[in-house]
């Protein structure tokens, strides 16, 4: 705890000494404008969790319990207006290795906006992610306890196979983002075509198309899939959106959860009920076809040759999310529910369960520069569950500078989805976060 307090002091005094109250800078030349914006988040996390073995106890390579985390983004939006048409480009730089910022920093892309709507070319974030509403919209802090927790450690495994868990609603913001829990390191998400209608009487809609979610910005080659044997059912050596699992007797399962011809859409409605009351509703969905089949193969222990034993069809992606946020005076509350059904699963491997869903809710109260919130999250992935409660508070020192503190308690219960005979195991823990967000 002393180390956590020391880290908090460093964050606070460094932020106060460096931050200045500024407005977002604009560079304007007649009909051409450049808008510069960005943010920096620094966070220290302390965790206490049961049933961790050996190096599972390490938050970082060489430290237990305490770790630091950062998120950084810088964006420049260049626009040119001719008559009633606005054309421009948004260029986003993320110095850290993982793309983990919010949808408002939705990556570099070209856009064209008219009175009929807005088209985004090459955006890595789809329409459903940008229009989706969750309970976390009203919370203080970051809700990032899952960055420090380890839910699939050695104690939770069976025959060396890990259980699958979801730890935040962010999974549903990118349910086909080329990975199983988060975007792969040093890669961006696949490029998309987005269209958004203008807001009309509180309503706004959007739709996106993604030809291939394996076509990420970080791939060296256009053909991301390097096959060790030819044919559509060949074993892929790719790392993007694919994992290979050892089951028994030298047998493996290769699961490719990339999607082709993916469509996503969303509809939001905002309404000012009175001078002090506002309501926002959202309904979003995603649909797509699996790029490849689940592959059951055997690896020769001597020659390492791969023999394909069988292939199985994965279910289509079918996902939806419902969300609402209500604000009255200083009080806010939000709730959301998301469901992926049996998306991208096959009964030959997902023997324990195939359905995935989540729900969450949050309440918040703000008075002057102080905001406090309480949030609850429940997820179920293949019958493996996570429950988490988070209490957070933040204090606005000046516009753009926001220190925060947060404490979360979580519980995960489950087993590897391939082994229905495995016992369900439980791990619990508490995470404390102290950090500062600087936005300009």
From Swiss-Prot:
Residues 1-19 form the signal peptide. Keywords: Signal. GO terms for cellular component: membrane. The keyword Signal applies. Gene3D superfamilies: Porin (2.40.160.10). The keyword Magnesium does not apply. GO terms for molecular function: porin activity. SUPFAM superfamilies: Porins (SSF56935). Coiled coil: none annotated. It comes from the Bacteria. This is Uncharacterized protein RT0064.
